[in-house]
């Protein structure tokens, strides 16, 4: 699928999208929900068009400006397909958009978002036999090898142990495909701020000895969504010559069962020196993120920290149309996330910033535990609190934890993955 903007007014064969209902139109848009419904119906249109044409034109010149970014973002997200391993390819369709009401810069930004969101989803959808921690790390190196502002360091398993990344070590030790800890440093001249992006990179999650059910294990090769989003965001931002320094940290592991696997109630020393009781091996994402967060704070003194993870599925359970939930102590960042999300039709819900729940992390046999907290049915909140425990107090104000969805495949509600929101949030800094 290729997205192009056209400056030439389309003919009568175009699909007319409008916010005015008193004219002859194909799609009427007046709200967030109408955009969701439109993106679903457009899927069916595309199936027909692929059989009869090589392109499709959307005339959105009559669409209110407030809906333009949202409409374009959602239809491109909804039409995404991953067909790399299908031998009989579906004909690629060119999508032309006529939108004279927006500037060339806005169009350029939308193309950047759409292209890099697609590349991110392609990374997410790679199966675990094609994307091990090592191959993911190597692919990242190849992606940035021509960018002179980017340097990459890949910690292999022995170096992970040597650095004291005990929680990454504990999970990564379970597999014949050992862990990697990827550090990507985008460092433009005269940068004034440092932003750390941290992504959960579990290339396959069986749950380990806290093994998942058959149904729950499906699509767990996508548990590297957080790491993929971080890489995709840096690719997009570096191509715009973004002004601030960006550090991307990707702890990459397989969570599988073996003779070396971590077991329930084992105790492990984290990077920050705290001991952690591993009550639930299937709560591995928060473990590797905890080490990465502590590593970021100690080594880079960041002005902002954003972590991304398919951690608990809270966003999916709370509402079918939420792209992600998030935890932050910063009201301004929260307002920015909400406002940008409204502009791009990526809805989110803020997890309550109740820091007093830190005391519920206490273990009887270690400093903290990673699961089985006294506050039941609150995993989205408690996993956020667990992560905050590994961030020194002075860094907590400008930290946001994004609990995102497994949404890089074609789902029934065409949910967006939040890429546009994350990209524009960082651009504002």
Question: What spans do the regions from the language model cover?
Answer:
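A generic structural signal for tightly packed, nonpolar segments enriched in small/aliphatic residues
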Residues: 8-10, 134-429
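Short amphipathic alpha-helical segment within the helicase RecA-like ATPase core
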Residues: 1-201
């Amino acid at each position: 699928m290729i997205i192009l903007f056209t400056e030439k007014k389309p003919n009568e064969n175009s699909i007319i999208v409008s916010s005015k209902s008193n004219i002859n139109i194909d799609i009427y848009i007046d709200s967030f929900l109408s955009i969701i419904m439109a993106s679903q119906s457009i899927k069916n249109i595309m199936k027909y068009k692929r059989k009869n044409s090589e392109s499709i034109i959307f005339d959105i010149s009559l669409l209110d400006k407030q809906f333009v970014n949202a409409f374009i973002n959602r239809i491109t997200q909804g039409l995404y397909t991953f067909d790399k391993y299908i031998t009989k390819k579906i004909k690629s369709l060119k999508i032309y958009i006529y939108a004279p009401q927006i500037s060339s810069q806005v169009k350029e930004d939308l193309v950047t978002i759409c292209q890099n969101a697609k590349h991110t989803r392609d990374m997410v959808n790679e199966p675990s036999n094609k994307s091990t921690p090592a191959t993911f790390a190597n692919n990242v190196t190849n992606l940035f090898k021509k960018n002179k502002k980017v340097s990459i360091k890949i910690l292999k398993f022995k170096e992970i142990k040597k650095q004291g990344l005990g929680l990454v070590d504990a999970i990564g030790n379970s597999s014949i495909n050992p862990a990697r800890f990827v550090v990507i440093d985008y460092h433009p001249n005269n940068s004034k701020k440092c932003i750390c992006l941290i992504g959960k990179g579990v290339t396959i999650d069986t749950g380990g000895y806290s093994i998942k059910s058959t149904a729950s294990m499906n699509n767990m090769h996508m548990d590297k969504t957080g790491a993929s989003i971080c890489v995709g965001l840096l690719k997009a931002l570096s191509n715009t010559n973004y002004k601030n320094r960006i550090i991307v940290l990707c702890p990459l592991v397989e969570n599988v069962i073996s003779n070396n696997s971590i077991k329930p109630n084992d105790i492990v020393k984290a990077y920050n020196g705290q001991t952690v009781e591993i009550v639930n091996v299937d709560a591995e994402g928060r473990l590797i993120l905890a080490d990465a967060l502590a590593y970021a704070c100690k080594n880079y003194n960041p002005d902002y920290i954003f972590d991304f993870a398919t951690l608990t599925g809270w966003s999916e359970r709370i509402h079918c149309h939420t792209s992600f939930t998030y935890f932050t102590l910063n009201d301004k960042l929260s307002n920015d996330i909400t406002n940008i999300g409204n502009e791009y039709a990526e809805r989110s819900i803020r997890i309550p910033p109740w820091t007093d729940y830190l005391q519920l992390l206490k273990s009887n046999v270690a400093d903290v535990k990673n699961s089985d907290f006294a506050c039941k049915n609150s995993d989205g909140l408690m996993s956020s609190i667990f992560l905050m425990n590994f961030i020194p107090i002075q860094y907590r104000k400008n930290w946001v934890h994004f609990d995102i969805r497994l949404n890089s495949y074609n789902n029934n509600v065409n949910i967006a993955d939040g890429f546009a929101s994350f990209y524009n949030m960082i651009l504002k800094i």
